[in-house]
């Protein structure tokens, strides 16, 4: 039987391949036929007009025989091509394909007969012509207003032990579209010895049964579908077989929801009835026992120990800059927007460009010279040598010039760029590296963020003759320990990192030092105060660069002040 099916399938495939070849050949032979007819017509025109012999003044009869031979040859070729074309057209294999099959095998619609899509559900229950009281109702629903003579006879088979009291419960019981009560088998897969009383709740519908979902409503078909003439083999003729099929599908679905332990008979849906106690289901209910969640080991920006700094102290520092008290209430929103700006404007594009440069280096035959693997010195040399081929490498190297451990820096930048708002940020440490915890030989996340922020503004500020290395912003507005800013100079406006581990940042402006509380927000609040002063007291200008909408576009985080 299997060999015969394979031969049938191979024959079908061979036929479709042949049809595709003939479809392509039809176009070719038709083109050649038209070309041969055209050439034969041109030669015949020359034979009657004698243009070549007259123009070149040569003997006419030898040329006439040559032209006659060519005209005959082209005419025969044209006849042969047209005969092949009509052969492919009239004698094509007779095969019936659905539109999806025609698209799959690539057979033109004109060469195959179209057939409608087969119905996905072919097993249906034959039902005789329904009586007027059955019109518009589900065959698995129960209507209390229906008389016993009009009730379907298989209801007692589908729901064993179900004996409803047939009573006239509604005044419009004679209407063809009566209100019905539909008992869903999804909630009660098997109901035994159940007899509803007239006082039972009724779920009414004006146009048919209530759709409660489940497999029975999924496999049901409307009564109008049963009257359509189809093959007898497409029906389930045994009502018990239908009931068994529905129950088995419900049992499979229930076991799939409970998991592999539901294979025992105690968890079978046929055992869920009113005669069993709760203790019988202890094994199943144990799967859904309430348990406390385990504490996540992932780093979180909300669990730092140093985040217990006094909010009141921060408000006192901000009060020296912001005179309007309600603005201080927006500090959390400003911090979130600023973190998101760093991620979307610097981190994500930086990681993308690093991966792009790594791909370009491999294409140039330098697989050993990669970002995250080679030293910063090698990358700087490559940026000079490969500048015409990879112009962005020189820019990326500036962001990576913070630690000798390039592998850790590359992986940490990728981790920080995930999540949209630097969710893995750790202000006084960093991430794990090769299975070991972060140590002081690696830069903190605060140092990394501060470095890339300064490098980004270095690239936006115009070059300055005092700073040939291009670090204009870093040289003017960032001082790192052990160096100290000149507080006596009124023009000094910078961010001072007074401590490396743990990192601590202060703002120096007009001979004043603004020391915000330590913790995970110290870096962001210091930078926010730096930007806020630029917006409110420097007209949004950092030197000759506008940090507003027409420039760097970072001051939008404060909104309209």
Swiss-Prot record:
GO terms for cellular component: Golgi apparatus; membrane; nuclear envelope. Residues 220-229 have a biased composition (Low complexity). Residues 120-149, 191-233 are annotated as: Disordered. It is found in: Membrane; Nucleus envelope; Golgi apparatus; Cytoplasm. It is a multi-pass membrane protein. Its main location: membrane. InterPro entries: Cytochrome_B561-rel. The chain crosses the membrane at residues 28-48, 60-80. Residues 125-140 have a biased composition (Polar residues). It holds the Pfam family CytochromB561_N. Keywords: Cytoplasm, Glycoprotein, Golgi apparatus, Membrane, Nucleus, Transmembrane, Transmembrane helix. Glycans are attached at residues 94, 273, 343. This is Transmembrane protein 209. The lineage of its organism: Eukaryota, Metazoa, Chordata, Craniata, Vertebrata.
């Amino acid at each position: 039987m299997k060999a015969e099916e394979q031969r049938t399938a191979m024959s079908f495939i061979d036929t479709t391949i042949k049809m595709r070849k003939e479809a392509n050949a039809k176009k070719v032979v038709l083109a050649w036929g038209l070309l041969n007819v055209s050439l034969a017509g041109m030669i015949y025109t020359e034979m009657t007009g004698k243009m070549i012999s007259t123009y070149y003044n040569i003997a006419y009869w030898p040329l006439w025989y040559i032209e006659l031979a060519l005209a005959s040859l082209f005419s025969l070729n044209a006849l042969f091509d047209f005969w092949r074309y009509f052969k492919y057209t009239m004698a094509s294999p007779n095969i019936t394909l659905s539109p999806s099959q025609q698209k799959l095998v690539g057979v033109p619609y004109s060469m195959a007969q179209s057939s409608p899509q087969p119905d996905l559900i072919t097993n249906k229950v034959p039902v005789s012509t329904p009586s007027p009281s059955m019109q518009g109702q589900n065959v698995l629903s129960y209507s209390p207003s229906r008389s016993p003579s009009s009730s379907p006879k298989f209801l007692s088979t589908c729901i064993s032990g179900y004996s409803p009291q047939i009573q006239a419960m509604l005044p419009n019981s004679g209407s063809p579209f009566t209100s019905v009560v539909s008992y869903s088998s999804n909630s009660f897969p098997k109901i035994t010895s159940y007899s509803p009383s007239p006082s039972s709740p009724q779920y009414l519908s004006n146009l048919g049964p209530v759709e409660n979902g489940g497999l029975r409503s999924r496999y049901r078909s409307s009564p109008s579908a049963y009257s359509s003439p189809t093959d007898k083999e497409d029906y389930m003729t045994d009502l018990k077989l239908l009931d068994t099929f529905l129950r088995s599908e419900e049992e499979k679905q229930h076991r799939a929801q409970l998991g592999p332990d539901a294979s025992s008979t105690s968890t079978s849906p046929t055992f869920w009835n009113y005669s069993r106690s709760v203790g019988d289901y202890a094994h199943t209910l144990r799967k859904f026992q309430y348990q406390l969640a385990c504490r996540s080991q992932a780093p979180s920006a909300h669990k730092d120990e140093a985040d217990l700094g006094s909010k009141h102290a921060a408000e006192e520092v901000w009060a020296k800059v912001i005179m309007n008290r309600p603005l201080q209430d927006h500090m959390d929103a400003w911090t979130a927007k600023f973190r998101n700006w760093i991620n979307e404007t610097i981190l994500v594009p930086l990681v993308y460009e690093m991966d792009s440069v790594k791909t370009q280096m491999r294409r140039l035959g330098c697989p050993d010279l990669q970002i995250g693997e080679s030293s910063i010195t090698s990358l700087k040399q490559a940026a000079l040598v490969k500048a015409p081929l990879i112009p962005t490498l020189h820019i990326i190297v500036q962001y990576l010039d913070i630690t000798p451990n390039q592998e850790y820096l590359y992986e940490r930048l990728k981790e920080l760029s995930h999540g949209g708002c630097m969710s893995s940020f750790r202000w006084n440490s960093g991430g794990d590296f090769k299975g070991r915890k972060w140590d002081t030989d690696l830069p903190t996340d605060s140092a990394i963020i501060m470095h890339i922020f300064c490098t980004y503004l270095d690239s936006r500020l115009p070059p300055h003759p005092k700073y040939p290395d291009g670090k204009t912003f870093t040289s003017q507005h960032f001082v790192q320990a052990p160096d100290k800013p000149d507080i006596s100079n009124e023009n000094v406006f910078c961010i001072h990192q007074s401590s490396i581990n743990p990192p601590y940042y202060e703002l120096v402006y007009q001979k004043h030092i603004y020391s915000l509380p330590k913790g995970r927000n110290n870096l962001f609040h210091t930078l926010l105060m730096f930007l806020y002063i630029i917006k409110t007291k420097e007209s949004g200008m950092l030197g000759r660069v506008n940090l507003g909408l027409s420039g760097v576009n970072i001051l939008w985080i404060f909104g309209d002040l």
